[in-house]
């Protein structure tokens, strides 16, 4: 350790892991809301879980948790709680809210759940140049907007199936807090978007339509920027999870 460098704290590292793990509690709170017909509680818990997920990585790097607690896999904790709060809970909420036809609910949700498992375990799920590969299981956001704009059950099913297919399409989607291109603008827009979502959830089920429409700006920005940057990236070596650099004089594999 360099002279004068602060010694990493085991207590702080454990607190960061505990912070990540609160996502499991938030998943239960959200499920409690679904069971008791409180959609706002369910949506609120998913929103808070998203904030936790957006901030715990930076805290973990600052606390140097991999160095201090090498036997505790924070990434695995993150994956468990993300699957609960980004995938399982949103599907539970959408079904309970009548967002899918009863005959189609189980098969459609099964496709979402199973495709998302692959999305979490794929070797190139996160690249070294800070992209997610394949649709990154933003089901919490998808379900919020399907419910917010009262999309029909048939269209809901079509959207869920289409996005499930995109899990397997190796398109890179930006990692909002880490992709360097336009990072400052992305974080500013994401922060403004978060404020709008707080208003929407607080006023649920009747938020002002103007706010609902304005909140679409960031998702549209996210999709457009992801597609533009993906088109500019070099060929991607999925097996190694990094941009593939072909041997001199030889074709890219």
For each of these PLM feature ranges, what is it?
Residues 29-46, 80, 84, 88-109, ...:
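Helix-coil boundary and interhelical linker segments in multi-pass alpha-helical membrane proteins
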Residues 8-18, 72-80, 125-133, 176-184:
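Short, amphipathic, aromatic/basic-enriched membrane-interface segments that mark the entry/exit
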Residues 1-3, 132-253:
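C-terminal membrane-associated helical module and adjoining short loops/tails
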